[in-house]
Amino acid sequence: MRHGISCRKFSRPTAHRLSMLANLAVSLIRHERIVTTVAKAKDLRPFVERLVTVGRRLAKKDPVRGRRLLLSKMGGDLDAVNKLLDVLAKRYARRPGGYTRILKNGFRAGDCAPIAIMEFVDRKEGEPKKVAEG
């Protein structure tokens, strides 16, 4: 029975699934908006929310520890960690949570999978228009 299980398996081993979530999180942090399936977006949301919360809390209190922790969770991508600590942590300093939103966006042409746009809340419209495919 599946009591208390909160994540999907995506027919992947655990390491592959965690790597996929880390890659999606890095893409979301870099571009601030990605297009992916609804199931992946729903699994990605708590992962990214935790990363932003850790970055927000440790940006001032213990930046070295925060940077190392985020590097381990995000696959060692230093540019994304720097953006998270320098830009996003300051943007959401007063926000207690709910940093992302999921917008349903129809179905994919090849396999009719439900597609969603995942983006950060309070994102300026003048910021990057490019949408990363995930």
Swiss-Prot record:
Annotated Gene Ontology cellular component terms: cytosolic large ribosomal subunit
One GO biological process term is:
translation
The protein's matches in InterPro entries, at most eight in alphabetical order, are given as: Ribosomal_bL17 (IPR000456), Ribosomal_bL17_CS (IPR047859), Ribosomal_bL17_sf (IPR036373)
Q: Which domain of life is it from?
A: Bacteria
Give the Gene Ontology MF terms in alphabetical order. structural constituent of ribosome
Spell out where the chain crosses the membrane. Answer: none
Q: Which UniProt keywords apply?
A: Ribonucleoprotein, Ribosomal protein
On assembly, the entry states: Part of the 50S ribosomal subunit. Contacts protein L32.
* The family this protein is said to belong to: Belongs to the bacterial ribosomal protein bL17 family.
PANTHER family, alphabetized = LARGE RIBOSOMAL SUBUNIT PROTEIN BL17M, RIBOSOMAL PROTEIN L17
Task: Please name the NCBIfam families in this protein's record.
Answer: L17
Q: What is this protein called?
A: Large ribosomal subunit protein bL17
Source organism per UniProt: Anaplasma marginale (strain Florida)
Per the record, the gene is rplQ
